[in-house]
């Protein structure tokens, strides 16, 4: 099941230097301008391709220990279309491959817009520019 995470909750993960999550930014051109600290860029037009999905799984498996449970947090600009679609496809893949015990598929509520607003209102420096 796909879960949701708020900007406030994500801020807590980053500030506490948790090592059990990975943010995946699905925006195409906007990532180069600014993005969430340590986010991975997987540019998606409408839906993630099989090649991108396989590369993402490989990257996660190479980065995180096999015994570690990892929250994979997807977002696009507003997390109303691409973010939820990709998170759902990722979740389906986890179920088909029987690896739901390793990864959790999450959506950042409100996407990058909500994150940017939260950072601005909280005077946080958790956005990387250029």
Curated annotation (Swiss-Prot):
GO terms for biological process: response to arsenic-containing substance. It comes from the Eukaryota. InterPro entries: Rhodanese-like_dom, Rhodanese-like_dom_sf. Residues 17-124 form the Rhodanese domain. GO terms for cellular component: cytoplasm; nucleus. Keywords: Arsenical resistance. GO terms for molecular function: arsenate reductase activity; protein tyrosine phosphatase activity. Involved in resistance to arsenic compounds. This is Arsenical-resistance protein 2.
């Amino acid at each position: 099941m796909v879960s949701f995470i708020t900007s406030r909750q994500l801020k807590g993960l980053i500030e506490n230097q948790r090592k059990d999550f990975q943010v995946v930014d699905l925006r195409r051109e906007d990532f180069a301008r600014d993005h969430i600290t340590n986010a991975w860029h997987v540019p998606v037009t409408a839906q993630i391709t099989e090649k991108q999905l396989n590369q993402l799984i490989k990257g996660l498996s190479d980065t995180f220990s096999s015994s570690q449970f990892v929250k994979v947090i997807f977002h696009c600009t507003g997390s109303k279309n691409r973010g939820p679609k990709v998170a759902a496809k990722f979740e389906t893949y986890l179920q088909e491959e029987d690896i739901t015990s390793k990864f959790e598929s999450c959506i950042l509520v409100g996407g990058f817009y909500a994150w940017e607003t939260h950072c601005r209102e909280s005077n946080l420096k958790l956005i990387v520019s250029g």
